[in-house]
């Protein structure tokens, strides 16, 4: 009987933890994402949709801008997860590659810019703690992480371009390379 009671308590505790997690999302990440979305759309309305579309069209002409500069700026300005939403301004064919690059930027830039991905800063701080224990400055680690990330995140987007083309060929589909006006 004790085993059944123990199992029942554990089972109910699972839902208690799930409820607490849900409440933390409702009071934490969900309002933040909602307000960031409102903020981003307000900036777009203030700047003008046509100017944002022109910048996206300009960025989509060059893979370095599309998978290097735009994801970095989006991660820096909007943080995770809103940086991923900037891909909506690119042509359909570039969206998978932008997502690959931008999602990596939300990780590799957090050593120097912790506001990008606050939820992951404990990983960097754990590594930086080891560097500090050795008597070294963790800033150099953060800069190296950022610089390597700039290069590797660009390549992640670029390689995803090639894999997207392979998948399109396999599936017999064609994603548009033209920017649609929003």
Curated annotation (Swiss-Prot):
One of its GO terms (cellular component) is plasma membrane. It is a multi-pass membrane protein. The phosphoenolpyruvate-dependent sugar phosphotransferase system (PTS), a major carbohydrate active transport system, catalyzes the phosphorylation of incoming sugar substrates concomitant with their translocation across the cell membrane. The enzyme II complex composed of SrlA, SrlB and SrlE is involved in glucitol/sorbitol transport. GO terms for biological process: phosphoenolpyruvate-dependent sugar phosphotransferase system. It comes from Clostridium beijerinckii (strain ATCC 51743 / NCIMB 8052) (Clostridium acetobutylicum). InterPro entries: PTS_IID_sorb (IPR004699). Keywords: Cell membrane, Membrane, Phosphotransferase system, Sugar transport, Transmembrane, Transmembrane helix, Transport. The keyword Nucleotide-binding does not apply. Residues 1-182 form the PTS EIIC type-5 domain. Induction: Activated by sorbitol and repressed by glucose. It holds the Pfam family EII-GUT. The chain crosses the membrane at residues 28-48, 63-83, 139-159. This is PTS system glucitol/sorbitol-specific EIIC component. Its main location: membrane. It is found in: Cell membrane. It comes from the Bacteria. The EIIC domain forms the PTS system translocation channel and contains the specific substrate-binding site. The gene is srlA. The lineage of its organism: Bacteria, Bacillati, Bacillota, Clostridia, Eubacteriales.
